[in-house]
Amino acid sequence: MEIALVPLENGGAMTVRGGGEAGTGCSQAIGGELQCPPTAGLSDGPKEPAPRARGTQRGVDPGGRPLPPLPQDPQQPRRLPPEDEEGEGDPALGMAEDQVLGAGSLHHQRVLINISGLRFETQLGTLAQFPNTLLGDPAKRLRYFDPLRNEYFFDRNRPSFDGILYYYQSGGRLRRPVNVSLDVFADEIRFYQLGDEAMERFREDEGFIKEEEKPLPRNEFQRQVWLIFEYPESSGSARGIAIVSVLVILISIITFCLETLPEFRDERELLRHPPVPHQPLGPSRGANGSGPLAPPSGPTVAPLLPRTLADPFFIVETTCVIWFTFELLVRFFACPSKAEFSRNIMNIIDVVAIFPYFITLGTELAEQPGGGGGGQNGQQAMSLAILRVIRLVRVFRIFKLSRHSKGLQILGKTLQASMRELGLLIFFLFIGVILFSSAVYFAEADNQETHFSSIPDAFWWAVVTMTTVGYGDMRPVTVGGKIVGSLCAIAGVLTIALPVPVIVSNFNYFYHRETDHEEQAALKEEQGSQSHGTGLDSGGPRKASWSKGSLCKAGVSLENADGARRGSCPLEKCNLKAKSNVDLRRSLYALCLDTSRETDL
């Protein structure tokens, strides 16, 4: 039998693009060679002699007789038969095609993820959208790969993975399944390392209030000073400053209360206004005998400042105010924003708390050089009345403790969040006071022994009754008045009880929010230390395993991978149905015998 061999142009090399015909998009040059643009195929083959038929020579038949020359068409080069292309070809073409097609198909290559026995299937390109996460980073997820089952196994919460996988599929949208609690889903977010940004978006979607970022000064020295005086939990020295501040506040409040005791108050009055030793017993007349002679005020006013400075309460108050002033000035000069510092309500309270001291000291200094005038006693009485009102402002120092007390901060946030409910409560009380005070006045109008002389006079009784205090100083005596009083008490109980659950709910919310924030901060520190330790220990083995897997993947063709995926489905179903150790061993044995299944890393 004679075999006709076709002479090949360009040494038998052909340009293949996507499995199509050779020479697609190419033109023939004068020398008979094909010239192709870069987009026409992958690459030109090497110019090598065409492979000879096995056991034959070029131009002779099997019997050794020369063959007649065949007619050639220089314009239309002949192609090899399909069987020759498949059987005899350049291996470089197949490798190039596998590389390009493998790079394109790797993005769409499917991957199996086993979550506590529940299998999920997705594409590698879907996971690669977030390369910094656990599933998106090949080096991170490699430690969970099971080469026998060709899947990644995670012993985690199964319902939560629906939301985790949707995060990759949707491009970053995180939705918690309805049958998963908040804390469990938050743990899954941290385990799969979705990042702080995903956690913040999750908290916002769930209704959590975003934590305000604490601004810090840019200067390093100012930052350290600001942290020491503003955030007691930042360091040991900051806690020491906070303890000193709390002690000074308590001493100031105790002094403010003790100086009003009768024994201390009388002693202070004697120090400030001692009796005049040369005062005559009987009434003295003036020079013209028209009236009594006014007592000399010079000995009383002149030594006023030394006696005030010698007062122990004044010394303690001065010491406390010096500390408050020092603390306020240091915090003001170290704050990151002077405008924000001036608008802060707590800083305004600090200024108001030390303001009365300087007014009192200025008043004492202003009265020191005064002489004995006729109207000076009246001016002193007026100034003392004003000073009493100003000294009352010192009681606001109690609010300085809220800077160092989480409980007071929670209470303040609760009242701030419940302003609408408190406004409704006051509005309902106002309506009830007007209604029941008018009713009790007209019910008691005909009685001579009534305690309600007018409607405004009955306001006090209505407020005391609606709040269920009941002092008893004002009470109705007639039957109609007692009926009105009973209705007033019942209405007061109902009015006050309505907004109380909302206020309690707000308090619980802020309380648990504060406690959860502290627990999360401690958990972050613990997780950070653990991740640092595991990263140092397992970094080398992970890198070596990933390199080995990459080499194994380079030798797997697209057809074999597709066949492995198709052939793995029955085995996976068998594994899901295995309910005993015997069935499990059989399924593993069948999996090991499956030679068409390739390891996919």
Swiss-Prot record:
Modification after translation is described as:
Glycosylated. Sumoylated on Lys-210, and Lys-524, preferentially with SUMO3. Sumoylation regulates the voltage sensitivity of the channel.
Main localisation, per the record?
membrane
Where are the residues of the annotated region Disordered? 19-93, 275-297, 521-545
Q: GO CC terms for this protein?
A: cell surface; intercalated disc; membrane raft; plasma membrane; potassium channel complex; voltage-gated potassium channel complex
| Stored SMART domains | BTB
Residues of the region (S4-S5 linker) are 406-419
What family, per the record?
Answer: Belongs to the potassium channel family. A (Shaker) (TC 1.A.1.2) subfamily. Kv1.5/KCNA5 sub-subfamily.
PANTHER family in alphabetical order: POTASSIUM VOLTAGE-GATED CHANNEL SUBFAMILY A MEMBER 5 (PTHR11537:SF250), VOLTAGE-GATED POTASSIUM CHANNEL (PTHR11537)
Designated name of the protein: Potassium voltage-gated channel subfamily A member 5
